[in-house]
Amino acid sequence: MSPTTPKKSAAKKTGKTPAMAAAPKVLLDLLNACGPSGYETAPAAVWRDAAKGFAKVSTDVVGTPLALVAPKHDARSPARRLLVMGHIDEIGLIVTHIDDQGYLWFGSVGGWDAQILVGQRVVLDTRAGKVTGVVGKKPIHLLREDERKKVAEIRDLHIDIGARDGDDARERVRIGDVAVIDAGPVELPNGRLLSRALDNRLGSFVALEAARLVAEAGGAEWELAAVAVAQEEITFGGSRTSAFALEPDAAIVVDVTHATDAPGIDVKEIGKHELGSGPVISRGSTLHPQLFELLYETAEREMIPFTVEASARSTGTDADAVHISRAGVPTGLVSIPIRYMHSPVELVQLEDVYACARLIAAAALRLDGDATFSR
């Protein structure tokens, strides 16, 4: 669907999106942190520290940080609980073998297009600190004709850390150490940001920012539990355990989706979601219709531009795990359009990020203490 056309007006209680948004320090710190699935300690610490100023903070054994924003003083007791989550892990690489020449062989953590990896500089997270390497393969000059036609596979690639031999490499790197591509955030013109790990440090930032906006407004009728869930790219582990432990009365998941204003993307398949068109509200079989309507109506009331994305089956996000937790959780999904997903050069319009946080905060503030999502 086409985005709604907003009038020039600040949203009540939930802040105002800057005309030409800049990247906040906490988002840049999140993007600079190394945190593939299962190894999210560094970005989780950034997120947790940022939440301490306005929420009660903790971390579970899976590695998911939680920020609880208390309901306003005159809210019904006990208050209902809204869970807002965005996963904080990223795709990465994991060392599976170190050969006697000192080359590191690796597997993928999450879904990679192997062609993207060739020639990339990487940073390995080891017990001794950061180790720099490069993903290598046989040079094109030495490839046979049949090899030149073959698409690169991860099993054909290795990481070179400049080791003299296997012993030298093993002194610095262990089996099971992880790596990410060395591609930190770069602010581009027109309020755009380029980085690896926008999928989904953006979602974790939005959950954090929405919680901050609700706290700044004095709380909502519902308690708000914001989480930056671990392990989405591999198992949905963080969302499964968080939804089970927190027993929310409703949930809103924040992730990224494909921006369709890049070459080669068919809007007939996934809809029209351009950079700058605002958050993308999902509607589909696994998502609760009343939460969709709440988000849709809130966006219209707050004059926030948005688009709608249809999801016929599963969404490929944490929403798939949350909505079937325990006896079921009414779940909504809001996404941020980005270009070049699962690459080191993901690209976003920062205004969309701020607008997404504003939308979720405004929806949380609209929830009545007696609201139910029965069908």
Predicted feature locations:
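N-terminal hydrophobic/helix-forming segments and targeting peptides
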Residues: 1-375
